């Protein structure tokens, strides 16, 4: 795994402005990551994002099309799409929730959305795909379930996520790639605490808070994030997955969150967030 250098240069309560260095590339947080699902933005050229530091690409979709052999011929995703800044790849966990599938303790059986065939994604395959893509930041495969599921189901999901995280951590071997753990647990603070403890024990390069923006109220989300952030280390990035509206991001920036993403968002939002973040921290 590749360490991320993080320096907090300004604070406003729990909110923080960080200078971050990864693979000789520098960026500041808080930031929003535009989602380039298959390595491209819909209806927009990459030069539209010339001032953007990070994009998110989708492991599930890139694995299916164009496929790893094509991307491998280019030496990785950066060269394939002509992107010189940072790429974060998700693991396939969200598609495990959003696309009809079958979960078991070993992984997720998917139906290929292009041809209907079935394939099985487990923690090691997810790592193999992301290491072949050679993204700067990879995510572990996690067990994402509806936030309103019962306690026992949430408990099983965090145990599965822990087991998958351990397998991913052991399998990961790309020294140029950072690896993030994911904290799950639904609305239950004791499960969020247990999941955070599980992730911290594996000493990842950064930590995501997952399972949000899929059914909870705004107040519930703030309480979950506030509680969880307090358990995460100051010297690691904090990433709330799947949230990218301005009001929602500002709520969580105030609680110390650094990174956000959302596929269903107007492309002008990241630029607006950047302006707001400068105002929040009164840099001048």
State the predicted function of each range.
Residues 190, 194-197, 245-257:
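Catalytic cores of alpha/beta
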């Amino acid at each position: 795994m590749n360490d991320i250098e993080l320096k907090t240069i300004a604070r406003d309560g729990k909110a923080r402005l960080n200078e971050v260095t990864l693979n000789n590339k520098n960026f500041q947080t808080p930031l929003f990551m535009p989602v380039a699902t298959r390595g491209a933005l819909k209806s927009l050229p990459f030069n539209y994002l010339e001032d953007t530091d990070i994009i998110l690409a989708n492991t599930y979709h890139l694995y299916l099309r164009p496929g790893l052999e094509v991307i491998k011929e280019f030496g990785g995703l950066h060269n394939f799409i002509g992107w010189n800044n940072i790429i974060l790849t998700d693991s396939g966990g969200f598609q495990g929730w959003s696309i009809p599938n079958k979960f078991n303790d070993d992984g997720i059986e998917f139906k290929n959305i292009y041809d209907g065939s079935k394939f099985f994604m487990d923690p090691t395959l997810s790592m193999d795909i992301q290491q072949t893509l050679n993204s700067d930041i990879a995510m572990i495969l996690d067990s994402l379930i509806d936030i309103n599921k019962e306690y026992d189901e949430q408990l099983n999901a965090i145990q599965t996520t822990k087991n998958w995280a351990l397998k991913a951590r052991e399998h990961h071997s790309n020294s140029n790639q950072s690896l993030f753990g994911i904290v799950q647990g639904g609305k239950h603070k004791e499960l969020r605490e247990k999941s955070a403890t599980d992730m911290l024990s594996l000493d990842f390069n950064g930590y995501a808070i997952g399972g949000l923006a899929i059914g909870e109220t705004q107040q519930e989300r703030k309480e979950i994030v506030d509680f969880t952030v307090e358990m995460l280390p100051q010297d690691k990035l904090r990433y709330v997955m799947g949230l990218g509206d301005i009001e929602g991001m500002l709520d969580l920036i105030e609680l110390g969150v650094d990174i956000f993403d959302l596929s269903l968002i107007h492309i002008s939002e990241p630029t607006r967030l950047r302006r707001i973040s400068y105002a929040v921290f009164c840099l001048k």
